Amino acid sequence: MLFEATHTHPATMCPLKTTEGKASLKQLFSDQNIKKAGIKLTAAYFSCPKDTALDHKGFFTIDADNAVTVTKFFGTMAVDVRPIQTLKEVAKML
């Protein structure tokens, strides 16, 4: 099942601004950690560091058994997790 996990953080607290934050993101999204979590990361996009707005956003499309698995993967990183489907699947219902 596909899920979209969206993360928002203040630009002033962007993890890409610190060595520790960069290392944490690198570890979280490592192939080993993704495999261990039992998910498939199908797409990931960040508005930072290009975004100069007050808040930065991260968008993660994940294939997983359920939303709980997705939330657990992110640990202490706050995410809004929602089930999604492709536009092609939605179009079939129109």
Where are these regions (language model features)?
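Short amphipathic alpha-helices in soluble, non-transmembrane regions
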Residues: 70-78
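Conserved short beta-strand edge segments in small beta-sheet-based binding/regulatory domains
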Residues: 79-91
